Amino acid sequence: MLYHLLYPLAGDVKLFNIFKYLTFRTIYAMITALLVCFVLGPWVIRVLEGLQARQVIRTDGPESHLQKQGTPTMGGVMILAAIVIPTLLWADLSNQYIWTVLFITIGYGLIGFVDDYKKVVEKNPKGLSPRQKMFWQVLLAGAVGTFLFLKPGFNAQLFVPFFKNFHPDLWFWYIPFVTLVIVGASNAVNLTDGLDGLAIGPVAINAATYMLFSYVAGHATLSAYLQVPRVAGAGELAVLCGAMVGAGLGFLWYNSYPAEVFMGDVGSLSLGGTLGAIAVITKQEILLVIVGGIFVIEALSVIFQVGSYKYRGKRIFRMAPIHHHFELKGVAEPKIIVRFWIITIILALVAISTLKMR
């Protein structure tokens, strides 16, 4: 919005010429997102407390979690506001990729909101059924996959890090592949959101990593030099990624141990889906497995646990997702959280290193 209002006036007011710089708008999207969280945070927490939107803690989980009983949840609405508002203010709103990602951000946020509202406000413990949630997730992700597949100039090739000449064309299978990436990322983040700050920290790190890759993908010279897939217009997603980083840090202000508020499904489903959509548009889907390694490990721990119990009658972990396994082994919650953040930072550095490893 500010870009469209002020940049056209740059001929008369030279100061407004700064709005053409992507780096400037990305930095201020990040700062704006932080401010949105700081301004809205206390109010959102009070409203959630007034609605009795409080987290219900499982009695079969770690005993230390019982003290979290009654903590407000659905704080993801704050995150959504802190992503959407700065993006609308600082991004070039004529860019189709911005609206494509916001479609997933808001759409998945609505799915999570309805599920949370039914569970914690209407006191319906089932919320949306898994089948209902999956239906809407697949529908929205499939719509994005179809849009990209039919978009002129956007190819259906899969780019694999470390292999500069290996670009298999997925053709029609690109649509289910996009669906898998977005839905998988969404649910992986959702499974990770089990400790104070455990999910939002890696999400912010992932967003910062994709902020860099979005900028490179949209830059003709840099993408050619680094042999990164060139996606004209994808650079604008750096602004949205910047907003995600700011929103993540702002929410962490309230969600760090001991948490004053939880993000709920409205936050986790939306954030994961957003990362998946950005990965797809920047042609860095495989990279998400690297930088989002913590999310992958958390999801796989659940899959292996369920599969092992179903077919062998035995559990691999004391409890899944794997962060609960470490809790039951006596590792303190803050230590698990910080260690997972450290691992994510290392994985992000590995992901960034692929820019020079072709």
Swiss-Prot record:
Instruction: List the pathway annotation.
Output: Cell wall biogenesis; peptidoglycan biosynthesis
Q: Known CDD domains for this protein?
A: GT_MraY
Protein's membrane topology:
Multi-pass membrane protein
A GO MF annotation of the entry reads: UDP-N-acetylmuramoyl-L-alanyl-D-glutamyl-meso-2,6-diaminopimelyl-D-alanyl-D-alanine:undecaprenyl-phosphate transferase activity
Q: Keyword check for Cell cycle, yes or no.
A: yes
* Any one Gene Ontology BP term: cell wall organization
User: Cellular location of this protein?
Assistant: Cell inner membrane
Q: Which reactions appear under catalytic activity for this entry?
A: UDP-N-acetyl-alpha-D-muramoyl-L-alanyl-gamma-D-glutamyl-meso-2,6-diaminopimeloyl-D-alanyl-D-alanine + di-trans,octa-cis-undecaprenyl phosphate = di-trans,octa-cis-undecaprenyl diphospho-N-acetyl-alpha-D-muramoyl-L-alanyl-D-glutamyl-meso-2,6-diaminopimeloyl-D-alanyl-D-alanine + UMP
List the record's Gene Ontology CC terms alphabetically: plasma membrane
InterPro entries linked to this entry: Glycosyl_transferase_4, PNAcMuramoyl-5peptid_Trfase, PNAcMuramoyl-5peptid_Trfase_CS
Keywords of the record, alphabetical order, are:
Cell cycle, Cell division, Cell inner membrane, Cell membrane, Cell shape, Cell wall biogenesis/degradation, Magnesium, Membrane, Metal-binding, Peptidoglycan synthesis, Transferase, Transmembrane, Transmembrane helix
> Which pairs of Cys residues are joined through disulfide bonds in the record?
none
Q: Where are the transmembrane segments?
A: 27-47, 73-93, 97-117, 134-154, 170-190, 197-217, 233-253, 261-281, 286-306, 335-355
PANTHER family for the chain: PHOSPHO-N-ACETYLMURAMOYL-PENTAPEPTIDE-TRANSFERASE, PHOSPHO-N-ACETYLMURAMOYL-PENTAPEPTIDE-TRANSFERASE HOMOLOG
What HAMAP family does the annotation carry? MraY (MF_00038)
Q: Which family does the record assign?
A: Belongs to the glycosyltransferase 4 family. MraY subfamily.
Chain's role = Catalyzes the initial step of the lipid cycle reactions in the biosynthesis of the cell wall peptidoglycan: transfers peptidoglycan precursor phospho-MurNAc-pentapeptide from UDP-MurNAc-pentapeptide onto the lipid carrier undecaprenyl phosphate, yielding undecaprenyl-pyrophosphoryl-MurNAc-pentapeptide, known as lipid I.
Could you tell me what this protein is called? Phospho-N-acetylmuramoyl-pentapeptide-transferase
This protein's species is Pelobacter propionicus (strain DSM 2379 / NBRC 103807 / OttBd1)
Q: What is the lineage of its organism?
A: Bacteria, Pseudomonadati, Thermodesulfobacteriota, Desulfuromonadia, Desulfuromonadales
